[in-house]
Amino acid sequence: MKADPRVHWFDVDVSDPEAVRARINDWTEERTRGRIRNLLSPRSIDQMTRLVSTSALHFQAEWRRPFRKEKTAPRPFTRADGTEIPASMMQSWMKARFARGEEGRMLELEYVNGYVFHALLPDAPSGLERLEAQLTPATLNRWTDSLESCEVDVWLPKFQREAEYDLASELSALGMARAFDPARADFSGIGRSSDGQPLYLSKAVHKTFIDVNELETEAAAATAMLTVTMAMPKARPRLEEFHADHPFLYMIRNGTNGTILFTGRMTGR
């Protein structure tokens, strides 16, 4: 890893935890071009901290077929509970890849850099949780394999979202519970603290930012894991509609190999 120029290692003096936190936050902010700030909150590092593993990812790309700003108009966005909120809805007739399933539809919008934006829209405003529950790698592949190029009437809300998550419970549910248990964690492959005490994970913090507008999408994500000691146009052929005026899932993926960089849900909250 030290030979990889994208990996940065530095030793710190945890006798000054706030200085350490500031240095890590500055590194993350620089790598995400200012979009992820204060990844680590005050007092998240103390003198028992032995290792902080931080990752950062920034994505910014223009649409291959941009939306026209003058077409953006206020429209209601219906949330899962049936209430409506105003949304700035981007609108365009465009050639895009589209698929329709039993309970929803998928739209693929291209970026100029070879990445794609996938939006998965349930038929009903209350259908997002059911659609998510059915989404597995296999079902996602079936959706993408079904995509076909056609003319689509696209409505997509402009949105900007920031979120912060503590991933400890999610990672534990995925089989990493031992890593967070001071009595069972085994990081002997990494080493021990200078006082010989074993290491364990105390928390895993993840922050995200995404901005979707007429010209481009910008997204950023950062994760920190802390290790401590025990202490209406003319008719067109095959016209489809994709009106994202209620909750939907979205992903930014590599258009060649399908790798998911970002995923989220637009719920109107």
List each language-model region with its residue ranges.
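Non-catalytic, conformational "gating/processing" segments within enzyme and secreted inhibitor domains
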Residues: 1-130, 145-234, 239
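Feature captures eukaryotic membrane-trafficking machinery centered on endolysosomal pathways
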Residues: 108, 236-269
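Extracytoplasmic and endomembrane cell-envelope/extracellular-matrix remodeling and assembly machinery
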Residues: 133-134
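C-terminal, non-catalytic macromolecule-binding modules
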Residues: 137-140, 171
